Swiss-Prot record:
Organism, as annotated: Pseudoalteromonas atlantica (strain T6c / ATCC BAA-1087)
GO CC terms in record: cytoplasm
EC number from the UniProt entry: 2.1.1.199
Top EC class for this record: transferase
Any one of the GO BP annotations: rRNA base methylation
GO molecular function: rRNA (cytosine-N4-)-methyltransferase activity
Similarity comment text for this entry: Belongs to the methyltransferase superfamily. RsmH family.
Keywords of the record: Cytoplasm, Methyltransferase, rRNA processing, S-adenosyl-L-methionine, Transferase
Name assigned to this protein: Ribosomal RNA small subunit methyltransferase H
Residues that coordinate or bind S-adenosyl-L-methionine: 35-37, 55, 80, 102, 109
Keyword rRNA processing recorded: yes
Role: Specifically methylates the N4 position of cytidine in position 1402 (C1402) of 16S rRNA.
Catalytic reaction equation(s): cytidine(1402) in 16S rRNA + S-adenosyl-L-methionine = N(4)-methylcytidine(1402) in 16S rRNA + S-adenosyl-L-homocysteine + H(+)
Amino acid sequence: MTTQPSHLSVLLQESIDGLAIKPDGVYLDATFGRGGHTKQILSQLSPNGRLIALDRDPSAIEAAKALADDARFSIHHCNFSEMEDVLTSLELHGKVDGILMDLGVSSPQLDEPERGFSFMREGPLDMRMNPTKGQSAAQWLAHAEEQDIAQVIKEFGEEKFGKRIAHGIVNARQEAPITTTAQLAEIIDLAVPVKDKFKHPATRSFQGIRIYINSELDEIRTGLKAALNSLNSGGRLSVISFHSLEDRLVKRFIREQSRGLQVPHGLPIMQAEIDSHKAMKAIGKAIKPSSDELSRNVRARSSVLRVAEKL
């Protein structure tokens, strides 16, 4: 019997290797999910090690109860942008040896129709990573201006037919409320004039709406800064992204933190002074899944791992 994709953590070994685990160290899994990365980290920690996990999804918090008997482990129900508050309360801020961030929507979220993330499974049009907070996708689409819908789909979904799709959504909601994933997928399918044979026409639009509903890019920007502040000197940051918008943010952040002091060309200043302002250094190049992993887990196909170390 083969393992289903929903149980597979993407770039598991590579991301853990990037953390350079110290058996007695303190680690943070900023996106617990179903605990694949957490369990791998725990397997390398001594009884003196410690792992703090975060997740904003109540179902992930429920799944973490399976680790409740492990004294090295604790989980907190919050966004990863709030990690500094959690670590400060534990007196661990600035003392963390490694942080792992696995961005985007998780496989269990995609696989549960009632969560409303997937156009492949009919369910209520929700898309919230924390279904107890904020407005659902259905609620937003019911009242959003056509130009705002178009902008979200174009900017966050990188969908070139954003205006046509937004127009189709507004016309459709005048006939009946858009409350299910299947309804929205059909509206998008009808609006897209040219189909990509390798991708469902609703893929980009669903991504864009989901990113907007969950403020995902703002969360990443804040989370990356919080991670840098939370690490100790020599601590590692291991980040897995799943589409170009996420990876662009991670790549830019690491590059900016690795630059050092920016001074006008020709200004007489020592290289040591420039280097002293560097906050991080990149560890190796971006890592993508092996062909073997892709054969086992198609959802890994767009993933990218980047690792950096705090100086």
